[in-house]
């Protein structure tokens, strides 16, 4: 969390992944306009694979989804991104979008459109 916080404070445009962030890191990203691409599918796609302890995978995913919801509630910028090609993350998969919609609830479309617009503006 400290490295993400430091990167945001230094003005980084976006952060990819970030499963173990805390409130200070989220706040720094929000205050500096850093777009977060949480790549939840890299965690979510591990469920039921038998490769890792299911309880551990569930706990990591739950924490990451809670952070996504908290960041959105702060007004943070979130954009979808899959890290396609990672283990169990095939190209063309929509699992990232489904997990983000689950984490963000009714506001998913609004939150994601703001994040995507900022990514397009920056890059």
Across the structure, where does each feature detected by a protein language model lie?
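Active-site loop ensemble at the mouth of alpha/beta enzyme cores that anchors a bound cofactor
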Residues: 35-58
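His/Asp/Glu-enriched, well-ordered alpha-helical/loop segment
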Residues: 52, 61-123
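Short, glycine/charged-enriched secondary-structure capping and boundary segments
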Residues: 10-11, 29-30, 51, 93-96
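Short Asp/Glu-rich motifs
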Residues: 6-8, 26, 48-49, 90-91, ...
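Histidine/acidic residue-rich metal-binding segments in metalloenzymes
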Residues: 1-36, 58-78, 110
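Residue-level marker of structural boundaries
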Residues: 13, 45, 120-121
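Active-site beta-loop-alpha junctions enriched in small/polar residues
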Residues: 1-2, 20, 41-43, 83-87
